[in-house]
Amino acid sequence: MTVVGELDPQKLTALVATAAEILDAASVPFVAGHRADSAVRKQGNDFATEVDLAIERQVVRALTEATGIGVHGEEFGGEPIDSPLVWVLDPIDGTFNYAAGSPMAAILLGLLADGEPVAGLTWLPFTGEKYSALVGGPLYSDGKPCPPLGSPTLADSIIGIQTFNIDSRGRFPGRYRVEVLANLSRVCSRVRMHGATGVDLAYVAAGILGGAISFGHHIWDHAAGVALVRAAGGVVTDLTGAPWTVDSKSVLAAAPGVHEKMLEIVKSTGKPEDYL
């Protein structure tokens, strides 16, 4: 039985084991570089630290040599994401947290096969948490298999939501994001803003969060986490309810049952363009 094309489960397991060793090695400079200064200014007020750049170089080199599969990284790009097989890397998810000294930062690594996430790894070096999964599950936490997600209620769930500026415009204006947050807060147990999309998705997969919303579209923020949530038995769509793909402009990931309720609330908020 194949997973995608000629990628069988045994080969996929070996690839993830190799990737885990590479992320373990990358965790050393990750921890050592905490509170690193900005090295590269990007669009808007985003930036990359020198550690981002160094870790991406290290992981790309190691993955390419060990697996023969190309890598698409946040900082340097690389292999096209529609390649038959490609690793997708975010060397530091939560760069602002990382530079400020917050432990809510992670290394994200997903494996796409013809655009479909077939494996994901999310390492939180400061907390020691390691999440990994293959397509079909289960989710592994620190190397141990986890039971599938249950069906909690939204009222009992903590929900993660992406950070924002209320005055921002663009595809999902700040005022729209605030209204989504407000409407969710009336129903869910608590709302949390970790400032790291990949951490939110890993925590959904682990059952720590009942659900999470990302208003972003970058593949490196989502590839690993989508694989984790799906492997754990969760549901991943965009904010319209369409199944998530590499072309999606947003993410709504949640446990069964919670996803349906969150989607209802998001849809009831109206169209983002109405908040410009």
Swiss-Prot record:
The keyword Metal-binding applies. Substrate binds at E74, I92, D93, G94, T95, R192, D221. Mg(2+) 1 binds at E74, D90, I92. CDD domains: IMPase_like. GO terms for biological process: inositol biosynthetic process; phosphatidylinositol phosphate biosynthetic process; signal transduction. InterPro entries: Inositol_monophosphatase-like, Inositol_monophosphatase_CS. Pathway: Polyol metabolism; myo-inositol biosynthesis; myo-inositol from D-glucose 6-phosphate: step 2/2. Pfam families: Inositol_P (PF00459). It is an enzyme of class 3 (hydrolase). It catalyses: a myo-inositol phosphate + H2O = myo-inositol + phosphate. Keywords: Hydrolase, Magnesium, Metal-binding. Its EC number is 3.1.3.25. Its cofactor is Mg(2+). Belongs to the inositol monophosphatase superfamily. This is Inositol-1-monophosphatase ImpA. It comes from Mycolicibacterium smegmatis (strain ATCC 700084 / mc(2)155).
